[in-house]
């Protein structure tokens, strides 16, 4: 009989940053006896999860996709935001083959160009500068009918901040003498990632048929009406703007979000021939271009295909003959699998995956503990099974509840995670396993935007904790997320592949 394995577990507490400011800080306000004890009694430090350290522009807040890609890669991975922004600046963007092909086809046939995406300066799922660049490109290549279908953010930026973006787009349309807003809807509907197809359908029907709950003559008027209905940007209901601009056969549709997880569902509604999420009233034959590859099995043109990452942690562990488990709730399952593996959808040899359904509630402040207890039940069972050399687990609570802006709920979310961390370390102590506890980016430690006085629902660029529950060790300061994979490999007594440029942060005594 084979010897039971003593796993090294990586616990990622999503959206759990560190701030010296105590006010409006859900992490500090929460009662976290387990994490307090672990930070006191074991080796701990702070590491960076934002800006240049994760391949984003200087000062740009981190996010879950970027964080998990960097953790899994063991090197700084330059992000699509940085890559596309640079190409717009250099002019290369305007020569992009797939974008040009879709635009030219529409222009030749006298068809419309539809552009959809998250209108936001947030830089997490999209950047409005990219969308503006796309509108300029369409105009330069001779498109006469340019329609922008705006998804509103209010999550990675203040909850009511879309008006300044609207004004910038209106100024662009005026300067070009062409183009306009055709529709507006909150990201809550258009960018679902949890198979809530009733939400997605509202965005789909709005864009394809001009069918919305509300109509307005301008985007500013649409937003003012939404605010009068007490809808923040994220939750703005389907609104048609101006005359209906339904999508027709032969039109071009370009999706300007660069982050995959919240772009997949709406994309599948447009491009999958065997789509079953909801009954589509209209299925126009469009020249659909996704800005980046949202999933390997989505068969449509892609402006910026992925650049392959060789020897990510998952791939390297498989090559070393090690077993691994990836486990999280629905909300962060893609992050511990697809993103952690550098955009690789399939499992490596010896890699198991376990998903726990996130609760079906409208917003997670209504159930801040989410499914953390069930997730921990499965994680503890996996630790005690003796089957795995390493386990990667994500607790979504700090991030998902932090995004709601509800302080008391975020405090409860942090307390729920702390309770679970206590259970995990207790199970590891029983089997002689070890644990690294960290986060991918900040969020819950800042719940009020002091400048606007609004709830702070976005991520932060603050550092995140790193605690090593294991042997006695000294820590190298100044670490970042890309140092975690080399740290894990070193603790497991394994070589670090040359592609990983991160450094091991724990030096065993």
UniProtKB/Swiss-Prot annotation:
<comment type="pathway">
    <text>Carbohydrate degradation; glycolysis; pyruvate from D-glyceraldehyde 3-phosphate: step 3/5.</text>
</comment>
<protein>
    <recommendedName>
        <fullName>2,3-bisphosphoglycerate-independent phosphoglycerate mutase</fullName>
        <ecNumber>5.4.2.12</ecNumber>
    </recommendedName>
</protein>
<keyword id="KW-0324">Glycolysis</keyword>
<dbReference type="GO" id="GO:0004619">
    <property type="term" value="F:phosphoglycerate mutase activity"/>
</dbReference>
<feature type="active site" description="Phosphoserine intermediate">
    <location>
        <position position="64"/>
    </location>
</feature>
<feature type="binding site">
    <location>
        <begin position="155"/>
        <end position="156"/>
    </location>
    <ligand>
        <name>substrate</name>
    </ligand>
</feature>
<feature type="binding site">
    <location>
        <position position="125"/>
    </location>
    <ligand>
        <name>substrate</name>
    </ligand>
</feature>
<dbReference type="GO" id="GO:0006007">
    <property type="term" value="P:glucose catabolic process"/>
</dbReference>
<feature type="binding site">
    <location>
        <position position="459"/>
    </location>
    <ligand>
        <name>Mn(2+) 1</name>
    </ligand>
</feature>
<dbReference type="Pfam" id="PF01676">
    <property type="entry name" value="Metalloenzyme"/>
</dbReference>
<keyword id="KW-0479">Metal-binding</keyword>
<feature type="binding site">
    <location>
        <position position="64"/>
    </location>
    <ligand>
        <name>Mn(2+) 2</name>
    </ligand>
</feature>
<dbReference type="GO" id="GO:0006096">
    <property type="term" value="P:glycolytic process"/>
</dbReference>
<dbReference type="InterPro" id="IPR036646">
    <property type="entry name" value="PGAM_B_sf"/>
</dbReference>
<feature type="binding site">
    <location>
        <position position="399"/>
    </location>
    <ligand>
        <name>Mn(2+) 1</name>
    </ligand>
</feature>
<comment type="function">
    <text>Catalyzes the interconversion of 2-phosphoglycerate and 3-phosphoglycerate.</text>
</comment>
<feature type="binding site">
    <location>
        <position position="187"/>
    </location>
    <ligand>
        <name>substrate</name>
    </ligand>
</feature>
<feature type="binding site">
    <location>
        <position position="441"/>
    </location>
    <ligand>
        <name>Mn(2+) 2</name>
    </ligand>
</feature>
<dbReference type="InterPro" id="IPR017850">
    <property type="entry name" value="Alkaline_phosphatase_core_sf"/>
</dbReference>
<dbReference type="GO" id="GO:0030145">
    <property type="term" value="F:manganese ion binding"/>
</dbReference>
<comment type="subunit">
    <text>Monomer.</text>
</comment>
<feature type="binding site">
    <location>
        <begin position="259"/>
        <end position="262"/>
    </location>
    <ligand>
        <name>substrate</name>
    </ligand>
</feature>
<dbReference type="GO" id="GO:0005829">
    <property type="term" value="C:cytosol"/>
</dbReference>
<dbReference type="InterPro" id="IPR006124">
    <property type="entry name" value="Metalloenzyme"/>
</dbReference>
<feature type="binding site">
    <location>
        <position position="403"/>
    </location>
    <ligand>
        <name>Mn(2+) 1</name>
    </ligand>
</feature>
<dbReference type="InterPro" id="IPR011258">
    <property type="entry name" value="BPG-indep_PGM_N"/>
</dbReference>
<keyword id="KW-0464">Manganese</keyword>
<feature type="binding site">
    <location>
        <position position="14"/>
    </location>
    <ligand>
        <name>Mn(2+) 2</name>
    </ligand>
</feature>
<feature type="binding site">
    <location>
        <position position="332"/>
    </location>
    <ligand>
        <name>substrate</name>
    </ligand>
</feature>
<feature type="binding site">
    <location>
        <position position="193"/>
    </location>
    <ligand>
        <name>substrate</name>
    </ligand>
</feature>
<comment type="similarity">
    <text>Belongs to the BPG-independent phosphoglycerate mutase family.</text>
</comment>
<dbReference type="InterPro" id="IPR005995">
    <property type="entry name" value="Pgm_bpd_ind"/>
</dbReference>
<keyword id="KW-0413">Isomerase</keyword>
<dbReference type="Pfam" id="PF06415">
    <property type="entry name" value="iPGM_N"/>
</dbReference>
<feature type="binding site">
    <location>
        <position position="440"/>
    </location>
    <ligand>
        <name>Mn(2+) 2</name>
    </ligand>
</feature>
